[in-house]
């Protein structure tokens, strides 16, 4: 199997796993009383969390595919890029969250998705073509 195909399969699999884990964590948080409402009273649905996790993870896999094709050191660039993007992704939950429990949960969801997708894709990028 080519590296591109392995990257697509691994990346999509990691995206689905990350989305499922995020959905479970969000549902548990909601059951524990975290309202997951951002400023303005807009509640974030669990299905929305899962959907956005998949979409942004797939976008990350596309970035990895581009790095694999056009970079001499795709793993290093993947890790640098994902560290920056993960850090940037933590800003909106902190700024938009209505309360500390919601902000903490949203930050945890971002970090959980990164903890699943980033190493899975990095391992695939390390595999010879």
Please give the residue ranges for each predicted region.
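Core segments of alpha-helical transmembrane spans in multipass integral membrane proteins
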Residues: 46-65, 80-91
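Membrane-water interface at the C-terminal end of transmembrane alpha helices
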Residues: 10-18, 112-129
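Transmembrane alpha-helical segments of multi-pass membrane transport proteins and ion-pumping complexes
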Residues: 18-30, 57-65, 114-119
């Amino acid at each position: 199997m080519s590296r591109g195909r392995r990257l697509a399969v691994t990346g999509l699999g990691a995206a689905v796993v990350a989305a499922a884990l995020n959905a479970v964590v969000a549902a548990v948080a909601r059951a524990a009383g975290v309202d997951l409402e951002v400023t303005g009273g807009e509640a974030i649905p669990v299905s929305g969390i899962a959907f956005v996790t998949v979409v942004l993870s797939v976008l990350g896999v596309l970035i990895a595919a581009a790095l694999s094709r056009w970079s001499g050191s795709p793993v290093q660039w993947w890790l640098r890029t994902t560290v920056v993007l993960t850090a940037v992704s933590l800003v909106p939950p902190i700024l938009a969250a209505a309360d500390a429990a919601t902000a903490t949960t949203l930050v945890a969801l971002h970090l959980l998705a990164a903890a699943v997708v980033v190493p899975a894709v990095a391992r695939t990028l390390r595999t010879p073509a």
